[in-house]
């Protein structure tokens, strides 16, 4: 290995949530038809995971539950047509049984999500990785995916990257019953692409393990002509659409465009015109380059200074009912800021309306298309500036409700809500800032103003002590140990959301 050459491994746990649910039931994750979804949210709910056996019927990993129901119905209609005597005599969720008996209908298990369990198993698996790799050389990309810099370990263990990846994956398999896919690359981008795109093409071994490898040369040879562009990491539909509108359909096209002459239509100037500074990363990835290393990830501190809380309501909410949820969300944002010792002076609220508002045909206002191409009323959006940085529940709630009262349409039902605290600053940084001078007019009473400021400070200090007491109680006894009275009214969501992790059942 050259002195500056590095080796990275990406590992992705196979259908993670579904695999955990199968193992909890003593079932084989590779042979059991199972979806992780909350049926109590109706069949429109999104499936968090689909087992590999069920995916084999053409069901995508993030399908909605009704799509699973419909696809299985279609599969069973075809199985019945081919079954002996045209009859299905039973059903099974076991793939081996279904392949052995053509008279069985395809069945599947629906497992409600248990996020706390998935986090617990993920931490257990991370502990397995730590047996081989130091934490500073591991980046946790998601609950079921990690990236590792294994450059310094190959010589230590006297092994290859493939053997090291396989050793770790088999350790995870034997400990938890969950298998995985791995990608190996000469940089972080290539190991991720090898895992996401190439490992799918590799036949699994006897343990269901797939491992693929890419370097810059093989990346260009194997993937420069690959379509669609959205299969590549960090290329979304918007990027792909812009590129295709300009005749760029593959990563090879993007790479060739980047070296065009200034007087030619296709040159890097076109890419920078389309994507701004983001074109630099797109060009690097088109060539299979990635300058970022693990040390850069560990040293990174995000520049964005906002915190948001959003939720999709279980059903369309009328104006007053949605206002109650907005209050709960604003309270939660304020308490989170206090817990983290962060303050804000700007808040935004976005109110998304339900499709039922346009279904009747009576709505005459401005519309936009939702992700399914349906017309819905354009969302309401507003911003409030506080004039002083704070984490006061009272001030934050008043500001957010003020936006809602001003911007939301009382005649429309609400489906989505997002509250965002902007321009966040740590409390300790505020204390270090010099006090801003106050300019008085001839008609101001400085003494009265001073008394008013002191009264407000006392009020804020009393409120802060109450808020900190609330936080202490919630930390000790749970988030639902103490709530405002509004959270017990019909339509309130805080109690249920406090039982969730990431919007799903804990």
Stretches found by the model and what they are:
Residues 359-363, 428-433, 495:
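Short conserved micro-motifs at the rims of enzyme active sites and ligand-binding pockets
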Residues 186-189, 284-287, 343-355, 413-425, ...:
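A glycine-rich phosphate-binding loop feature that marks nucleotide/adenosyl-phosphate handling sites
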Residues 147, 385, 418:
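Short aromatic/hydrophobic contact patches that present stacked aromatics
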Residues 2-3, 10, 231, 237-414:
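DNA-contacting surface of Y-family translesion DNA polymerases
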Residues 1-287, 291-294, 442, 447-506:
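Gly/Gly-Pro- and Ser/Thr-rich, intrinsically disordered tail segments characteristic of DNA damage-repair
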Residues 402, 406-472:
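C-terminal hydrophobic structural anchor segments
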Residues 14-16, 40-44, 353-358, 424-428:
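Short, charged/polar surface micro-motifs in flexible loops or helix N-caps
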């Amino acid at each position: 290995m050259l002195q500056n050459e590095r080796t990275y491994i990406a590992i992705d746990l196979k259908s993670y949530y579904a695999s955990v649910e199968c193992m909890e039931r003593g079932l084989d994750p590779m042979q059991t038809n199972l979806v992780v979804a909350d049926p109590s949210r109706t069949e429109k709910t999104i499936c968090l995971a689909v087992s590999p056996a069920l995916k084999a019927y053409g069901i995508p990993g993030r399908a909605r539950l009704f799509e699973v129901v419909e696809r299985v119905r279609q599969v069973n209609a075809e199985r019945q047509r081919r079954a002996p005597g045209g009859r299905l005599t039973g059903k099974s969720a076991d793939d081996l049984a279904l392949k052995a008996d053509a008279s069985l209908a395809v069945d599947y298990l629906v497992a409600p999500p248990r996020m706390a369990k998935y986090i617990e198993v993920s931490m257990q698996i991370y502990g397995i990785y730590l047996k081989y790799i130091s934490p500073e050389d591991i980046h946790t990309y998601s609950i079921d995916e990690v990236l590792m810099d294994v450059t310094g370990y190959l010589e230590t263990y006297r092994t290859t990257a493939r053997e090291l990846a396989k050793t770790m994956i088999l350790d995870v398999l034997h400990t938890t019953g969950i298998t995985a896919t791995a990608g190996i690359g000469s940089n972080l981008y290539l190991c991720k692409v090898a895992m996401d795109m190439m490992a799918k093409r590799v036949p699994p071994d006897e343990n269901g393990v797939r491992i693929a490898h890419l370097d810059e040369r093989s990346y260009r040879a194997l993937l420069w002509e690959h379509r669609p562009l959205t299969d590549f990491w960090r290329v979304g539909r918007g990027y792909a659409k812009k590129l295709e509108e300009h005749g760029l359909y593959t990563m090879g096209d993007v790479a060739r465009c980047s070296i065009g002459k200034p007087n030619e239509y296709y040159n890097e100037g076109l890419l920078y015109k389309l994507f701004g500074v983001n074109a630099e990363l797109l060009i690097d990835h088109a060539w299979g380059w990635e300058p970022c290393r693990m040390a850069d990830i560990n040293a990174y501190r995000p520049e964005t200074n906002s915190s948001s809380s959003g939720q999709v309501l279980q059903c369309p909410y009328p104006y007053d009912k949605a206002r109650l949820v907005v209050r709960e969300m604003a309270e939660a944002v304020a308490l989170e800021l206090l817990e983290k010792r962060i303050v804000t002076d700007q808040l935004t609220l976005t109110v998304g309306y339900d499709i039922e508002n346009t279904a009747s045909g009576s709505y005459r206002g401005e519309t936009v298309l939702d992700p399914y191409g349906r017309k819905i009323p354009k969302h309401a959006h507003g911003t409030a500036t506080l004039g002083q940085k704070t984490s006061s529940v009272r001030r934050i709630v008043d500001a957010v409700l003020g936006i809602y009262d001003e911007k939301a349409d009382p005649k429309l039902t609400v489906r989505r809500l997002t509250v965002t605290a902007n321009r966040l600053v740590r409390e300790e940084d505020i204390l270090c800032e010099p006090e801003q001078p106050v300019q008085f007019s001839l008609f101001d009473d400085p003494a009265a103003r001073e008394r008013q400021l002191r009264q407000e400070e006392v009020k804020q200090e009393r409120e802060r002590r109450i808020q900190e007491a609330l936080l202490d109680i919630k930390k000790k006894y749970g988030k639902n140990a103490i709530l405002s009275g509004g959270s017990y009214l019909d339509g309130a969501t805080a109690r249920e959301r406090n039982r969730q992790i990431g919007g799903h059942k804990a």
